[in-house]
Structure formats: C-alpha cells, structure tokens
Amino acid sequence: MPYEILIPRQVERQIAKIPREFATRILDDLEGFADGLDYKRYDVRKVVDSPKTAPRYRMRSGNYRVLFFILHNRMVIEVISIRRKKTGMDY
C-alpha cells in the first residue's frame, strides 16, 4: 500500500518557482518512493543531525534536494522543503 504524500502550501510555492521539467521529475520521484519506500533507488538518506524521535530524510532529484518526514504509523510522507543544492552541503 503506497504512502500518502503531504505537500504544505509553502512547499507548493517552492515547487511553483522551479522550472517545470525539474518540478515534474521531483514529484515523479516522490510518488515512486511513496509506492515502495526504495531508499537506494531514490537516493534517500536520513539527515545527520535530525532527532531520533522524528528523523528527517532527504532525497536527491537532479540538482534539487527534498527534505521530508516519514510518518510510518499514519503511512504519510510529509514534505518539509524543496531546494536547489548549493556548492556546500547547506540546505
């Protein structure tokens, strides 16, 4: 059973600013990940400094990074932000 993806209004605004081809790829990658939670295929990793009680994850999609929570008990992926990768590892 696939996970539901929650995208808050703030993140929708971020997506609207991204060129359409990249935004489509990001959303396709999110939907693919939600179907099977295949961490390796979609290059999903836990963010290093995230708390153990509510770990954050990041997904690489081209030059963009998607930050999100996975709420396993509710089968929900809640997107926090979508940003373009800078030269450093600062999100």
Question: Can you say where each PLM-predicted feature lies in the sequence?
Answer:
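A short, well-structured alpha-helix characteristic of acyl/acetyltransferase catalytic modules
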Residues: 23-25, 29
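A short, ordered amphipathic alpha-helix with a cationic face
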Residues: 1-2, 33
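A short, surface-exposed loop/turn module that caps and links secondary-structure elements
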Residues: 32-58
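Enriched for short, Lys/Arg-rich terminal
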Residues: 2-4, 9, 13-17, 24, ...
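Intrinsic disorder/low-structure terminal segments
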Residues: 21, 32, 56, 67-68
